[in-house]
Regions:
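N-terminal leader/targeting segments and the immediate start of mature chains
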Residues: 2-29, 35-40, 190-198
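Well-ordered beta-strand positions in beta-sheet-rich domains
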Residues: 44-48, 68-70, 85-87, 146-148, ...
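Hydrophobic residues embedded in beta-strands of well-ordered beta-sheets
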Residues: 56-57, 76, 85, 129, ...
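Acidic/charged, solvent-exposed loop-and-adjacent secondary-structure segments enriched in E/D, K/R, S/T
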Residues: 78-104
Length: 198
């Protein structure tokens, strides 16, 4: 249940999901950051998410390498420049299958399906909101602590993914206008501000 302040502003998970629903075909730019003890600063991955039809999700990486991941139904295919494509069944990776189903529900604005896998909690206003997603499945919870979505109005600007293992770094993916605002000269510290709506 959303806090009183969020309810007063007319913000809840149903309202957010109704605004985020995007009929296929659709696409959006992304900038993903990945931290590692081996790197002096987080690696930035630039690319595009696409949904050519209701059953297909495509993640295209443009830099610093070229790779396309296509998820359709229960199959995932990864094709990387200079390497052959490989296809595998999502049944081998149940947590990935669950995430794919949930992402599809998010893009359809399907609150009922999303709540089958996650507990939802919202804060903020329609102009600046946050929605937390906590996995209900014990299997997924062993891999994932929480997902937090940040947005403004009908725009999903950022997704933060917190692994269950506290030793693993948070993964941040900026989307839409937040991703477009990132350049090679954007300081790492500014990415969090962009993500959270600054």
């Amino acid at each position: 249940m959303a806090p009183a302040g969020a309810r007063d502003a007319g913000i809840d998970s149903g309202w957010i999901l109704s605004k985020l629903a995007r009929p296929a075909p659709m696409k959006t730019n992304f900038v993903e950051t990945r931290s590692s003890k081996l790197l002096k600063s987080p690696l930035r991955i630039y690319g595009e998410y696409g949904r050519p039809d209701n059953d297909t999700l495509v993640r295209t990486v443009r830099a610093p390498y070229v790779e396309t991941t296509t998820i359709r139904g229960t199959q995932a295919t990864i094709a990387r420049a200079g390497h052959g494509a490989r296809t595998f069944s999502l049944t081998r990776v149940p947590e990935l299958a669950s995430m794919q189903a949930s992402f599809g529900a998010l893009l359809r604005g399907d609150q009922a399906q999303l709540q089958q896998g996650f507990a939802l909690a919202t804060t903020g206003t329609r102009e600046h909101w946050r929605m937390g997603m906590t996995p209900k499945s014990a299997t997924l919870a062993r891999q994932l602590k929480a997902i937090t979505l940040y947005g403004r109005g009908a725009e999903l600007r950022c997704i933060e993914t917190q692994p269950a293992d506290a030793r693993q770094p948070l993964q941040r993916t900026l989307l839409a206008s937040a991703a477009m605002a990132v350049s090679a000269s954007t300081p790492d510290a500014a990415l969090e501000t962009l993500c959270h709506g600054g």
